[in-house]
């Protein structure tokens, strides 16, 4: 397989434009910032641009002056940034705050079945009883694995694994190997039963990021690796000629969506050179989707589990979104990192 080909200077410049535009947005302690800042942290790891640390630190420090707000699964996503800041600054306040969030997840967050987290959001008026959403893997599942490793807390780590296994059990179709957006445990169905693009982006990206945290001799490694392997095999067969994926993966009449594509393309890179030809096409398309001012375009708005396919098709995609910025940064950072590691 051919090596991934790219202009390192161009990719670095595009990353910088995205980061700068991201910090012209206003964020609360919620998932738009959580995903955006995850991407900024990844951008730092790839570029070592110290400005990115300062931007994140300034935002978090200002928020922490008021203490933690009431938490939800979506709000826990900021925990990724706290772990990053603890790593690069050594300041224990970030880890202590992240631990508070992990305690919320472990002991207070609503669950159902075999300990699967119910997806919860910051807005109290929106409640989804006993629903599992693929989004939770990014907001809380991966976070629990990461903090479990950092703090050597097996209970946190095992809960992270529980989320990956539980969400696979209820969301991954055993025939298509794609992930549904959500599962309703009360109704015992997948609601509208849609293979939503960003849901598959969340699942693929987080599994790819989870595997390096798990010992290869741990049974969970094989379970997650198998789920990801089969999902990626299905996803590459649905990639559009443009290099992007549709917001409804198996519906070519639905629009092409960039945040899902970035998450999927990043996950494809975890397989080394196996999927280089697909990643190469995605790279060109995602770079093209970044406006001159750093806005990542063609990113769908925050999406509840819609009632039908038409509902997903009507979700707007004209505005800047934190998750679009963050997922594009994550992908482009992974592209740059191929210069620093064995890619085979």
From Swiss-Prot:
Site (May be essential to modulate pKa of the D-135 carboxyl group): residue numbering on this chain: 31, 74
Highest taxon of the lineage: Bacteria
EC top class, as a word: hydrolase
Thermal activity profile: Optimum temperature is 50 degrees Celsius. It is stable below 50 degrees Celsius.
Active-site residues annotated for this sequence: 135 (proton donor)
Keyword field: Cytoplasm, Glycosidase, Hydrolase
Binding site for substrate: 30-31, 74, 118-128, 198-202, 308-309
Up-regulation conditions: Up-regulated by growth on type I rhamnogalacturonan.
GO MF: unsaturated rhamnogalacturonyl hydrolase activity
GO BP annotations, alphabetical order: carbohydrate metabolic process
Major localization class: cytoplasm
PANTHER family listed in its UniProt record: UNSATURATED RHAMNOGALACTURONAN HYDROLASE (EUROFUNG) (PTHR33886:SF8)
Role according to the record: Catalyzes the hydrolysis of unsaturated rhamnogalacturonan disaccharide to yield unsaturated D-galacturonic acid and L-rhamnose. It cannot act on unsaturated glucuronyl hydrolase (UGL) substrates containing unsaturated D-glucuronic acid at the non-reducing terminus, although the active pockets of YesR and UGL are very similar.
Family: Belongs to the glycosyl hydrolase 105 family.
Subunit structure: Monomer.
Protein name: Unsaturated rhamnogalacturonyl hydrolase YesR
Organism in which the protein naturally occurs: Bacillus subtilis (strain 168)
Lineage, uppermost ranks: Bacteria, Bacillati, Bacillota, Bacilli, Bacillales
